[in-house]
Design a protein with these regions (language model features):
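Broad hydrophobic/π-residue packing in well-ordered secondary structure
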Residues: 33, 39-42, 47, 97-102, ...
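Glycine-/small-residue-rich active-site loops that bind phosphorylated ligands and cofactors
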Residues: 13, 81, 157
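FAD-binding core/adjacent interface of flavoenzyme oxidoreductases
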Residues: 1-2, 72-150
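Short, electropositive alpha-helical surface patch
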Residues: 91, 156-163
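Divalent metal-dependent hydrolysis catalytic cores, especially in the metallo-beta-lactamase
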Residues: 153
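Beta1-alpha1 glycine-rich phosphate/pyrophosphate-binding loop at the start
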Residues: 1-73, 149, 160-163
Length: 163
């Protein structure tokens, strides 16, 4: 009987498993990777992408392509609930995924408080691809007028972004 392995997220902790996904498939495992993006971005290079040192293709891993090339299934979605008794994951799309074995590597996210004003000009550092969007807005808007940019947060990411 085929068992179902689900990798929740395609981040660093799953890189070795993703590189050897075909081994699981050849052992008759059905392998599904669930993630919010077809790519996984290396967060350590995010500030360099913001500063135009790197382009997105230089700091990302093609998760979907890697999974599908090895016989796995990639689902672009987000897990919103886990039922460990039923071994079932609920996805943001409304779909449900049953599993025999699941591993979580979903990374971090930034939850913004309610903020009034121009939401289109507020960028979080996660997901990392938002830094590219910020870079494009800054590049476009800075040709029109001098910009005032605020970095909120004093941790390592805030220091790197403001530097």
């Amino acid at each position: 009987m085929t068992q179902h392995l689900v990798l929740a997220g395609g981040g660093h902790a799953h890189m070795v498993s993703l590189a050897h996904l075909r081994d699981f498939v050849e052992l008759d495992w059905r392998v599904t990777v669930i993630g919010p993006s077809d790519y996984h971005y290396y967060s350590g290079m995010g500030p360099g992408m913001l500063g135009s040192t790197y382009e997105p293709d230089e700091i990302r891993f093609a998760t979907r392509a890697q999974v599908e090339a090895q016989g796995g299934i990639f689902v672009r979605d987000t897990i919103v609930a886990v039922d460990p008794k039923q071994r079932r994951l609920a996805l943001a799309s409304g779909a449900q995924v049953d599993y025999d074995l699941v591993s979580f590597n979903t990374g971090s996210s930034v939850q913004l408080p309610e903020i009034s004003g121009d939401q289109e000009r507020i960028f979080t550092v996660k997901p990392i691809e938002r830094l590219y969007e910020a870079r494009e807005v800054i590049a476009t808007q800075s040709t029109l007028r001098p910009l005032k940019v605020a970095v909120v947060g004093g941790g390592p990411a805030g220091a790197e972004i403001s530097g």
